[in-house]
Amino acid sequence: MVSLLENPLRVGLQQQGMPEPQIIVIFGASGDLTWRKLVPALYKLRRERRIPPETTIVGVARREWSHEYFREQMQKGMEEAHSSVELGELWQDFSQGLFYCPGDIDNPESYQKLKNLLSELDEKRGTRGNRMFYLSVAPNFFPEAIKQLGGAGMLDDPYKHRLVIEKPFGRDLASAQSLNAVVQKYCKEHQVYRIDHYLGKETVQNLLVFRFANAIFEPLWNRQFVDHVQITVAETVGVEDRAGYYEKAGALRDMLQNHLMQLYCLTAMEAPNSMDADSIRTEKVKVLQATRLADVHNLSRSAIRGQYSAGWMKGQQVPGYRTEPGVDPNSSTPTYVGMKFLVDNWRWQGVPFYLRTGKRMPKKVSEISIHFRDVPSRMFQSAAQQRNANILAMRIQPNEGISLRFDVKMPGAEFRTRSVDMDFSYGSFGIEATSDAYDRLFLDCMMGDQTLFTRADEVEAAWQVVTPALSVWDSPADPATIPQYEAGTWEPAEAEFLINQDGRRWRRL
């Protein structure tokens, strides 16, 4: 296996520069995201010599931990979640840059204490006043944390102070607008990094290159040649220990409004004027503003929700959503959402986009598939059984890569055809692992590159698209009316009808 530094895809390319030393302050540092994803991502960047050794991490949470105890907890987390990563001399050096500051989100004294610690660390670690404030806390704490940071003067420098906000950004259009108002009171837009870790995945980033760097595909990327598009993000896990959060969010807020909408934007947007952050995000906003649910007057024809019931996963029986610990037995929270979008613009007029996401599905898989129109006349035997024989599929996870399906003649005397796939896989290069989403996003934020982060108007435009469904689904509902699908199956029957009514079917993955 070769290391990422020896990635053959990077041969001959100039590596991204190294950011300035800075302090990364993680609010909610006692949560599992810190030791599972955030600290490991930063350690990986240090291991690959992508960030300077002066990089400093300060954890903030309510627990009364010491610096040393915080370091011990991060090391335990690394050993548990990333057992294959060597923790030797480099980890010892890296961990000396880990510090902890106990405090309450709503206590001004906590922020003054934090401010004093950061000033001390600037002198000790040589971080030159550069700060990144990462809000890895429950969404209801976002406004208060931002107000307190702003009130303490820790967001005053628009060029040295950056604010990173985890999704979900609001729970509907009104709350997103309210949160944006708080952010804009204390920050310039170029200071704000609204993070969606899906945008850090290699295949998602490659989508822009694939579309706009290859002349053979872009001319086909329109209503003349594309029959429809499917975007799937399927999970095998259930609600697990997130019932408290999930009961308030559901699949639409947790996944579709952010992750799937980002995949949708990159698939449907026009070519940007340049590859700078604002040009790309402006095109994403434009396509969102042209997007609508196919039929807002008869919602069942364009938006379907569902819940998983008891079933079998990998030979083991699993409970239904309503019997999971912490879930209301009469819950109407969707664990599955399927939607049909139409785009009112020149490129995509009349081409449906089908999006679906759900928990307890047969496979963990994320994919975008472009289904091209049929040939005008069927000339070959057995091809008549195939509709949309040409499919371009971009696999986000697992086995990141791209495949193109087309028909070929089967060997033999008869003119019979079958479909074959031409594949590109990142794994075929012998690379141990493609870059993790969080390490790429951390690096971009430290470098001041907002390309993979969402802008205020983009967030609001995405909420606007799904508002017709939210306004209905947020109303009290009879639990008996919520479609069910058995754990280990793909979707409720109503979601099959969503696409079957158009003479199409979901792609089996």
UniProtKB/Swiss-Prot annotation:
GO terms for cellular component: cytosol. The active site is at 259 (proton acceptor). The keyword DNA repair does not apply. It catalyses: D-glucose 6-phosphate + NADP(+) = 6-phospho-D-glucono-1,5-lactone + NADPH + H(+). Substrate binds at residues 197, 201, 235, 254, 359, 364. It holds the Pfam family G6PD_C. GO terms for biological process: glucose metabolic process; pentose-phosphate shunt, oxidative branch. Gene3D superfamilies: Dihydrodipicolinate Reductase, domain 2 (3.30.360.10), NAD(P)-binding Rossmann-like Domain (3.40.50.720). Catalyzes the oxidation of glucose 6-phosphate to 6-phosphogluconolactone. PANTHER family: GLUCOSE-6-PHOSPHATE 1-DEHYDROGENASE (PTHR23429:SF0), GLUCOSE-6-PHOSPHATE 1-DEHYDROGENASE G6PD (PTHR23429). This is Glucose-6-phosphate 1-dehydrogenase. It comes from Nostoc sp. (strain PCC 7120 / SAG 25.82 / UTEX 2576).
